[in-house]
């Protein structure tokens, strides 16, 4: 009787093991087909197979459905469906699902904005070692729920520990400026900037370049090191890094003066949104410096700089309109330059208005 029972038990366990093995393979098969279809842009087929995987308990399938409905890939955007699929995935300890869920609560998409729900979802993902969720928790405690600076620092630190460059950079700024209620520490600021820059954060490389260029934060002036960091920042599409390199070449500061290189760096920076670089291009076109003199291009670039908030660009643009006998535009642009804080623009505005 005991032997017979043992045989039944062994056969039962074998059957259960085989069934579980086959069931797992079926899940993986669904997921594999779905992922292949998704990569090829066949979202209809991908959705169908992700649903099969999700229904069979494969959390990745649920997460992918959340992504599909959140972004409207092959279907209309449906945040409510995305929310439900992310919830299912998060309940199964899928960190990407928790991250997606946190994002919807954070932004109030498909549901009422709820920072506490966002915190709960992000916190679970953070525990599951999801760097961006830790970082987003830092953002919430830093900027959205006031009076939680210590929590913000804690989660920025966790994201940095997980090699999230943005988290390291924010901590660098905090220690350099004494923000987030931390004790100002140049030493710590440099350590965090260095890590962030090694992780290819352009802002951090730009910050290091400035510190070495000016001998700030207890660092000795080292123009060669500064140049290298600024060059890396520019290569990482940081407009400030490119703008600084442009200034170096324009003025011949620490490098041989080279107006053409200066112009090229200013153009890069301007195209990335550096207002002052657009204005400097305007000046170079107005003077014919490294480029043929072209007042139309000068005006266009001053206008770009002014539109992005550079008071010098506004002042120069207003001057061009004045010289073109366009008093109305000159007054309007001087007024803008004045509001941006340029005293001379205010003085010229007063003269043009006659009071």
UniProtKB/Swiss-Prot annotation:
Its EC number is 3.5.2.6. GO terms for biological process: response to antibiotic. It is found in: Secreted. Gene3D superfamilies: Tetratricopeptide repeat domain. Pfam families: Sel1, TPR_8. It comes from the Bacteria. GO terms for cellular component: extracellular region. Keywords: Antibiotic resistance, Disulfide bond, Hydrolase, Repeat, Secreted, Signal, TPR repeat. GO terms for molecular function: beta-lactamase activity. Residues 1-22 form the signal peptide. InterPro entries: HcpB-like (IPR040239), Sel1-like (IPR006597), TPR-like_helical_dom_sf (IPR011990), TPR_rpt (IPR019734). Disulfide bonds join 54-62, 90-98, 126-134, 160-168, 197-205, 234-242, 270-278, 306-314, 338-346. TPR repeats lie at residues 27-60, 63-96, 98-131, 132-166, 202-240, 245-275, 276-311, 312-344. It catalyses: a beta-lactam + H2O = a substituted beta-amino acid. Belongs to the hcp beta-lactamase family. Antibodies against HcpE are present in sera from human patients infected by Helicobacter pylori. May hydrolyze 6-aminopenicillinic acid and 7-aminocephalosporanic acid (ACA) derivatives. This is Putative beta-lactamase HcpE. It comes from Helicobacter pylori (strain ATCC 700392 / 26695) (Campylobacter pylori). The gene is hcpE.
């Amino acid at each position: 009787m005991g032997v017979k029972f043992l045989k039944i038990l062994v056969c039962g366990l074998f059957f259960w093991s085989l069934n579980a093995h086959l069931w797992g393979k079926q899940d993986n098969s669904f997921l594999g087909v779905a992922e292949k279809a998704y990569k090829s842009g066949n979202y209809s087929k991908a959705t169908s197979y992700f649903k099969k995987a999700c229904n069979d308990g494969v959390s990745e399938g649920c997460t992918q459905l959340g992504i599909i409905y959140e972004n409207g890939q092959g279907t209309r955007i449906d945040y409510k469906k995305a929310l439900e699929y992310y919830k299912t995935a998060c309940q199964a300890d899928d960190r990407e699902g928790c991250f997606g869920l946190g994002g919807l609560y954070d932004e109030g998409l498909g549901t009422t904005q709820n920072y506490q729900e966002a915190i709960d979802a992000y916190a679970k993902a953070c525990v599951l070692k999801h760097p961006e969720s830790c970082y987003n928790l830092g953002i919430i405690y830093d900027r959205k729920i006031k009076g939680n600076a210590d929590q913000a620092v804690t989660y920025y630190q966790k994201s940095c520990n997980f090699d999230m460059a943005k988290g390291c950079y924010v901590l660098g700024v905090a220690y350099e400026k004494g923000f987030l209620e931390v004790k100002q520490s140049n030493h710590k600021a440099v350590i965090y900037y260095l890590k962030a820059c090694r992780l290819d954060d352009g802002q951090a490389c730009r910050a290091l370049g400035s510190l070495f260029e000016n001998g700030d934060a207890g660092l000795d002036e080292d123009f060669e090191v500064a140049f290298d960091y600024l060059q890396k920042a520019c290569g990482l599409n940081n407009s400030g890094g490119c703008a600084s390199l442009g200034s170096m070449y324009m003025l011949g500061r620490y490098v041989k003066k080279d107006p053409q290189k200066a112009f090229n760096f200013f153009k890069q920076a301007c195209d990335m949104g550096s207002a002052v670089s657009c204005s400097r291009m305007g000046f170079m076109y107005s003077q014919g410096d490294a480029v043929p003199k072209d007042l139309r291009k000068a005006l266009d670039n001053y206008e770009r700089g002014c539109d992005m908030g550079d008071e010098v660009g506004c002042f120069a643009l207003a001057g061009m309109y004045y010289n073109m006998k366009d008093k109305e535009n000159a007054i309007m642009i001087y007024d803008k330059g004045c509001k941006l804080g340029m005293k001379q623009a205010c003085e010229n505005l007063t003269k043009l208005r006659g009071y």
